[in-house]
């Protein structure tokens, strides 16, 4: 597994520098008085948990890195344990819809609300923690929704949620097969372009690079 991590490097640091400061995703948007010249990079994983989750968590722990896991609804005690481990290790647990089925999720505001409530309640029941961050499947500007995405965005705001898209991808969601080193190279080639980067990766059984 290729893990870049969430880190803040000095403005003049080059790609490949050692992590200097670990930050959670919620600190990407800072109060004006806390803004610095450092680059900030948030590592995020979508679609989990999966059988790869324990290995991802082990690697993150080894390197003292915190990440955000935007999870879907998975059933069974094994999945419940993975949810709990994400929280126990100090990572941010975010929502990525229960079903991840675009045709159902984005059919109407009612459908979206039902899906949201189902996942929100499940995660709170399993972990004891209330989620406050959300990532839309396909992103907030996807073209597959039958409903104006602004309706969903407004609803999340009413629930006290913040949604996050991404501006850097590692390439693990494409048809092309990349090695772990190539995934890292893809990320490092893009993070140098931004002061604040949100890196999209996936925690899925079929993605084991």
Show which residues each predicted segment covers.
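Catalytic domains of cell-wall/extracellular-matrix polysaccharide-remodeling enzymes
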Residues: 55, 77, 100-209
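Active-site beta->alpha N-cap acidic-glycine motif
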Residues: 18-136
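Terminal accessory/targeting
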Residues: 1-41, 58-67, 181, 192-209
